[in-house]
Amino acid sequence: MAQLYFYYSAMNAGKSTALLQSSYNYQERGMRTLVFTAEIDNRFGVGTVSSRIGLSSQAQLYNSGTSLLSIIAAEHQDTPIHCILLDECQFLTKEQVQELCQVVDELHLPVLCYGLRTDFLGELFPGSKYLLAWADKLVELKTICHCGRKANMVLRLDEQGRAVHNGEQVVIGGNESYVSVCRRHYKEAIKAACCS
């Protein structure tokens, strides 16, 4: 039975690695996968899902105007697909998450979504909000803070390495701009940034 999965975490927990491994597992069995990634995130190249450990795969791009249902249905009609995998799902719109539900319910295809739960202010991203609400299965991928506790928050850093406590929700960056931390160290960093 097909289901909608949401694998979520803070940054650097291995979401892209897990996506690539899942896709490989299907392909190894002779099954076709369709991989998507957000057009806005081109840190590792356009149309590429890349992991920090060196794995990568080509992917179709999506943006806020992309009809995922139309693309998936057309691809599936042309050559059967066995699994849909999407990276950077925090950037999905409400409508796109609804379309992914349709892919599961009407096309009977499993959909595996990978993304951040919250932004640098601790607020849900739109895509994450609706995936948390509508996914059949929620799976937290864990990473650790520098203190050894589970990291469930993301700090955005300025050029001097200080926490940023306001600004646009989406600013694309990697390890130089963001760090995953536990809630305690998140609060300490934000407090220090607000008081300086």
Swiss-Prot record:
Class in the EC hierarchy, top level: transferase
Binding positions for Zn(2+) per the UniProt entry: 145, 147, 182, 185
Any one annotated GO CC term: cytosol
Cellular location(s): Cytoplasm
SUPFAM superfamilies in UniProt: Glucocorticoid receptor-like (DNA-binding domain), P-loop containing nucleoside triphosphate hydrolases
Keyword Transmembrane annotated: no
Catalytic activity: thymidine + ATP = dTMP + ADP + H(+)
Record-linked InterPro entries: P-loop_NTPase, Thymidine_kinase, Thymidine_kinase_CS
Residues where ATP binds: 9-16, 87-90
Coiled coil: none
Sequence similarity: Belongs to the thymidine kinase family.
Subunit structure comment from the entry: Homotetramer.
UniProt name for this protein: Thymidine kinase
